[in-house]
Structure formats: C-alpha cells, structure tokens
C-alpha cells in the first residue's frame, strides 16, 4: 500500500482531473499512448508542467525557430540556461531575460523578487558571475490604486532581492497603460561574465554518476507555478497564491558563491537551476540533453516538513535550488563544499544508461517515463491568424498646443523620470558601474580590464500593436540604438515575448508578424538571439495586454577611456541626426490627445540604422561627443527636456520643424552633444542649439517658442511618479 494518498488512475481518467492540471483531453490521450498505459497522479503532474506553455513553448516554437541564433561572437545559443557571447581575451558575457508576470500580479513583492532570483541562478548555472541586473516593467495607469500597489510591491521586490544578493540594478524601462490593468509585466534580465574554459552546460551523462540536490529544502510553495504561468488571469487566480514562490536572497547569495566554487571542480559533469517546474524540469531536461536516463530517490530529497509527496516534491518551485551531476565517487567533495557554505545538500539519484526517467520513494515507483517524451514530444500547435481591423483614419495635429502638450507629456509616468523608483535599487555595488540608470544604457566595467559591457532592455508595445511586423523590427532597432548611444558595439540579444492568448486569431497573427519583423532586424543589425522566454495568456477578464516583445541586448566597449569625459557641459553644441517626419501612430502624443492607436507610421529602414549607427559610434569613440541620446518616447522636444533636466543645464535650440513634429516619434534619430572645439563629421547632422549655464529651457520653431525654467522642468519630471504614489499607503 502506498505511503501517500492520491487520486487513483481511474479517478484521474473518469473525473478528468488532468484538465485541472492543464492537460487537454487530446494531450492526456497522447500521454497514454507514450506510456502504453494510463498515467498515475505523479506522472500526470509531470507531463502537465513539462507540456505547459511556459516549459514547452507549444504555441511559439514555430516562431522561435526563425530567429537567427548564430554569429561571429556567439559561443552558446538557445537551449541552455542562458546565452553566451565572446568579448575577447578568453572572456564571455552571459545573459538572459525571463518573465514573472502572473506571480507578480498576485503577489507583487515575491513575484518580482523570485523573478530576479531565478534569472540570477540561470546566469550562475552557466558558471558566470553576475555583474548587473535590468528590468522591463508594465503596469496599468497610476490613477488606479491597484496599479500603484502593484508598482510599489514589484519595485520593492526587485530592490529587496538584488540589493541583498549584491548585484547592482543598472538599467530598465517602465511604461504605464490601461491595457496592463490587472496584468502587469515583470521581465528581469541578468548579465554575467565568465572565462571560456569555465562555461557549464545542464547535462546528465555518464552511467553511475550521481545527482546532487543543493539549496533550500523543498516545500509546497510554487506547486504548478509553470501551469499557473500558462493560464489567463481570472478572478479565481487570487486563490492560486500558493503557486507564487517565496525568495530568500541570503540563501541565494550563499548558493551563488557555492555554485561558482563548484564549477572549478573537474568532477562536475553538469548543473542546472531548479526554476519553472522545479526538480521535474531540471532533472528531465538534463537527462534529455545528455542522452541518458535518470533514477531519483525522492526519500533522499531535503524537505521542509514531513509528508511531502513525490507529486509535491517534483512540482514544487521552492526557490534557491540547484541540481548537479558529478562523477561517481566524488560526491563528498561537493557535499563538503555545500556544508561549508551552510547549504542543505544530498545525493538524490544517479544517471542510467536507459532512456527512462524513474522516480522512487523508498521501494515504490512513482513515475517511469521515457525521458525524451518530456523534452521533445510535447505537442506543437500551429494555429490560424487573422489581421485585426486597423483604425486608418488620420488624426489632426495641426492646431496642437505645444506648451500644454509638452507639460502633460513630461509628467506622464511613462515619460517622467524613474529616479524615484531606481533610487530604491543599489546601482553601484561592486564599484564597476560606469553609467547608472537615467537616460542611457547601462555600462559596467569588466573587472581587471579596460573593457566594459553595455546592456539595455527595451519594448515598443504600442507600435507592435499598431503594426506588428514593423513594430517587431522597431523594438530590436531601439535596443541597437541605445547601445550605439554609449559607443558600444551591439553583439547579441535575448527576448521575452509577452502576448495574450494565442488561441485568439488576432493575437496569433501578432505573434506571426512581430516575430518575423524581429527576426529580420536581427539579421540586418547582426544581433542574433541567444536566449529568451515566452509569456502567453497575459489576459485579464478577457482583455489582452498590448503585444509586448521585450528585447535585452548587450554590447562591447573595448576601451572605456572615452567615457571619462562623456558628460555634457554648458557651451556644448546640440546636433540632430536623422529625418523627422509626421510619425504619430503609436506615439505618446497620440495617446495623450486621441487615446486609441492609429495605423499610421512609415517603415523602418534597417540599412540606414546600420549606417547611422556606425557613424554615431565612431563619433563617440573619437572623443567628439559628450553625450548621445536617442530620440524616443514623446519626440524631440521631450528628449531635449530630459537631457536638460537630467544634467541640470540650460538649453537653447532653434528647430526647423512644425509644432506637431516636435512630438513626432520618427525612428532612427539621435541627439549628439558635441564638445567645445570639436567638429562633428556626420553628413546629415543638423546643428540645432547648445547647452547653457542659465536656468532656461528655450526651444523655438517657425510657429512657436517654448520657454521654461530648467529647475521647474526638473522638479516636474523627477517628481511626477512620487506624486502619483502619494495616494497609496
């Protein structure tokens, strides 16, 4: 008789309990076919999480296959815990972005904190030491108290985990729109550095080699977290609060240091973080990649309390855990290491020469599954898309009130300074941060060298909703420009695809078109995709979020000397690079004045992006520029105001544009601040003004003149978000 009371095989089938776990009738029947029998309760649980959208990408695999994944600098692409890219001198950068959207909607602090912890462990499992964190966040408008609470909880969670573990949060982006009401997006990115000969893989091979568990003892937290992340958010989602994991950054710090020491042991065969689907995914994926079988002895798994069943052990997503495969006979060496770091650890199984994934508790078998069926035989769904009906009417901007529009845009939380939020993050721990959060990409020095890694994370959801194909190209190009703006050579990217339900034809078409655009941009800009994540079913009460592909990109700065005086001063001249057109569809001014997204903006020219990018990068590296800013949300006037306010400098400019064009968001533009006595050699650059030491921001065109005190702009811009949050405890 079994030690654990669970539903019988007959009950699972007759009462269709598998549906509650996330399997459809067809998927359950396929499991029966694979096993040659009906599955027991633990086996159904294992298939349900491994075949969930979150783990199997069953609706998105066809789109992911089109991304370019190889390139001159790529050492390791998709398939492992994170991507690895060469930066010279036998060193590499390791990076990835992951989503933690659904957990953050239910429990914002822990959802965000464990998102940070999970992405850190992905980087550490490759053998890299993390050097910085980034995040991309989306919330509903801050006029809604629930959105204020979500924002405060998420920011506290990010800061609480990152600050405790000692990794600086150096860049990010946050946007607000009512399409994210009840369904915030929390995408966390981590970047690390490693020597080539220390790169690890998550593989289990070598018959008789041992499987070691290390980290927090397994509890009941996070059970079916992967399945929960693959569903729409509903009013019943609150009841799934136990599916949200609990983070412990202090144990996370110990685990990180112990892991980085363990990878120096020659006897280490493979290592993987226990992330989504916990012990199930880490063990079965390692076996599949190693072409081996595994036998786990679950009575040896460290548990937080007695009575935890094999089903619960395998599906728990308790945080701060790693799984290792080590050479037989060397187990004690690793156990002693983990004891030194005050971590629980145990030998819980061994590699076999079969193709079976076998789970035992004492002498009872709780699962016997073909390994490859979990990793490679999940169903893949190719659905039909359908173009949405676009709003093609033209909005009228001819009578725009420049001053009023400027002031309203400046204090909208999407455009306002995020200083109030970022100051809650430790930005300098490690003392290698060169450029902190604010206006630009992050730049972090590679310790012991004169090199630096630049990183950015970006999204353009309104544009992707407007025109998915062009919007997909645009988000990759935006990240590319942001790296160029600090003088970095873009190397590769990671992506997080946040969409609604793929079972809706319009959403599926957005996936088709936007990923096609992203893929084309990656090819032209030579930024292959080396890692990523997909988060679907981001819907609340039947309303989908905007399609929000987020791109994290890294670049290399071979010599940081030019950054020593990369800081604007009074007397430095301002140049605009790039043509300004009447591009308002998807823009912030369109949202402010008309609300809905109009289907109108011109295609992005990727070849022109490359040509301009090289010219701008060379200008920065030659020491001519003291600051470069991409022209982004809100348009040229807002971009100039942000530069002026951020540095506390006056600004005077005369621009040959219409009033409306001051707020146009035409892509591919840069503001270059040129040092006194230097000459800018970019043919299409137009001098538009200069920075001053006067407390005045003055921009004129043929129609209007806007004159404001810089100190007042700075106060409004930097204080807007704090002002929004004063209404919540």
Curated annotation (Swiss-Prot):
**Residues that hold Mg(2+) 1 according to the record:** 98, 533
Please indicate if the UniProt record lists Signal as a keyword.
Answer: no
Q: Where does ATP bind?
A: 57, 96, 495, 532
The record's listing under InterPro entries reads: PRibForGlyAmidine_synth_PurL, PurL_linker, PurM-like_C_dom, PurM-like_C_sf, PurM-like_N, PurM-like_N_sf
Transmembrane domains' residue ranges: none
- Detail which positions bind Mg(2+) 2: 122, 273
Reading the lineage from the top rank, the first entry is: Bacteria
Any idea of its EC number?
A: 6.3.5.3
Where substrate binds, per the record, is at: 99-102, 121, 245, 317-319, 535
List the Gene Ontology MF annotations in alphabetical order.
ATP binding; magnesium ion binding; phosphoribosylformylglycinamidine synthase activity
Q: Where is the active site?
A: 54, 100
Quaternary organization: Monomer. Part of the FGAM synthase complex composed of 1 PurL, 1 PurQ and 2 PurS subunits.
Q: Which family does it belong to?
A: Belongs to the FGAMS family.
- What's the stated role of this polypeptide? Part of the phosphoribosylformylglycinamidine synthase complex involved in the purines biosynthetic pathway. Catalyzes the ATP-dependent conversion of formylglycinamide ribonucleotide (FGAR) and glutamine to yield formylglycinamidine ribonucleotide (FGAM) and glutamate. The FGAM synthase complex is composed of three subunits. PurQ produces an ammonia molecule by converting glutamine to glutamate. PurL transfers the ammonia molecule to FGAR to form FGAM in an ATP-dependent manner.
Q: NCBIfam families in the record, alphabetically?
A: FGAM_synth_II, PRK01213.1
State the protein's name: Phosphoribosylformylglycinamidine synthase subunit PurL
Per the UniProt record, the source organism is: Staphylococcus haemolyticus (strain JCSC1435)
């Amino acid at each position: 008789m079994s030690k654990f009371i669970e539903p019988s095989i007959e009950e699972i089938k007759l009462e269709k309990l598998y549906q509650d776990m996330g399997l459809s009738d067809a998927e359950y029947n396929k499991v029966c076919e694979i096993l040659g029998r009906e599955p027991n309760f633990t086996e159904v649980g294992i298939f349900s999480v491994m075949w969930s959208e979150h783990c199997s990408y069953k609706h998105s695999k066809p789109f992911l296959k089109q991304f370019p994944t190889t390139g001159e600098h790529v050492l390791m692409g998709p398939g492992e815990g994170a991507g690895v890219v060469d930066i010279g001198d036998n060193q590499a950068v390791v990076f990835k972005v992951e989503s933690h959207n659904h957990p953050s909607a239910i429990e914002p602090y822990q959802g965000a904190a464990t998102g940070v912890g999970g992405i850190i462990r992905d980087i550490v499992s490759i053998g890299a030491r993390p050097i910085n964190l980034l995040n991309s966040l989306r919330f509903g408008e801050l006029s809604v108290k629930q959105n204020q609470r979500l924002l405060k909880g998420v920011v506290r969670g990010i800061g609480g985990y990152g600050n405790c573990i000692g990794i600086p949060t150096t860049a990010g982006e946050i946007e607000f729109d009512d399409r994210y009401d009840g369904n915030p997006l929390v995408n966390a990115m981590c970047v690390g550095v490693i020597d080539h000969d220390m790169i690890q893989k998550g593989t289990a091979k070598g018959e008789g080699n041992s499987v070691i568990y290390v980290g927090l003892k397994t509890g009941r937290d996070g059970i079916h977290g992967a399945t929960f992340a693959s569903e729409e958010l509903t009013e019943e989602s609150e009841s799934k609060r136990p599916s949200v994991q609990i983070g412990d950054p202090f144990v996370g710090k110990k685990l990180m240091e112990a892991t980085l020491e363990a990878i120096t042991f020659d006897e280490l065969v493979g290592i993987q973080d226990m992330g989504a689907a916990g012990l199930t995914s880490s063990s079965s994926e390692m076996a599949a990649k190693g072409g081996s079988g595994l036998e786990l002895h679950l009575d040896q798994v460290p548990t937080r309390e007695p009575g935890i069943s094999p089903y619960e052990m395998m599906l728990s997503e308790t945080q701060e855990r790693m799984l290792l495969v080590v050479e037989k006979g060397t187990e004690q060496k690793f156990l002693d290491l983990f004891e030194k770091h005050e971590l629980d650890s145990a030998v819980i199984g061994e590699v076999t020469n079969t193709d079976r994934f076998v789970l035992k508790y004492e002498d009872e078998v709780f699962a016997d599954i073909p390994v490859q069926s979990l990793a490679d035989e999940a169903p893949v769904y190719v659905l039909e898309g359908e173009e949405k009906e676009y709003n093609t009417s033209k909005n009228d901007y001819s009578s725009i009130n420049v001053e009023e529009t400027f002031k309203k845009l400046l204090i909208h939380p999407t455009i306002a300074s995020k200083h109030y939020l970022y100051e809650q993050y430790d930005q300098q721990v490690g003392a290698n941060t060169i450029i902190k959060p604010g206006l630009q990409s992050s730049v972090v020095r590679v310790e012991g060298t004169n090199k630096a890694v630049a990183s950015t994370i970006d999204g353009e959801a309104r544009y992707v909703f407007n025109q998915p194909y062009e919007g997909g190209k645009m988000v990759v190009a935006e990240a590319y420009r942001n790296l160029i703006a600090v003088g970095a050579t873009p190397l590769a990217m990671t992506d997080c695809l946040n969409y609604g339900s793929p079972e809706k034809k319009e959403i599926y078409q957005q996936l088709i078109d936007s990923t096609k655009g992203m893929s084309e941009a990656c090819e032209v800009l030579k930024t292959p995709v080396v890692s990523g994540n997909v988060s679907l079913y981001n819907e609340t009460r039947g309303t989908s979020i905007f399609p929000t592909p987020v791109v994290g990109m890294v670049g290399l700065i071979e010599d940081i000397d030019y950054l020593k005086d990369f800081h604007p001063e009074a007397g430095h001249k301002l140049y605009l690079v790039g043509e300004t057109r009447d591009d308002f569809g998807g823009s912030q001014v369109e949202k402010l004045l008309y609300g809905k997204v109009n289907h109108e903006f011109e295609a992005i020219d990727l070849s022109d992006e490359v040509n301009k990018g090289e010219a701008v990068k060379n200008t920065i590296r030659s020491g001519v520029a003291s600051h470069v800013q991409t022209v982004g949300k809100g348009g040229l006037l807002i971009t100039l105001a942000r530069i002026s306010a951020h540095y506390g400098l006056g600004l005077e400019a005369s621009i040959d544009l219409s009033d409306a064009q001051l707020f146009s968001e035409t892509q591919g533009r840069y503001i270059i601040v040129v040092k006194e006595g230097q000459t800018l050699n970019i043919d299409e650059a137009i001098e538009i003004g200069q920075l001053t030491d006067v407390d005045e921001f003055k921009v004129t065109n043929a129609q209007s003149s806007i004159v404001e005190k810089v100190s007042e702009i700075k106060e409004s811009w930097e204080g807007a978000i704090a002002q929004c949050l004063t209404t919540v405890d």
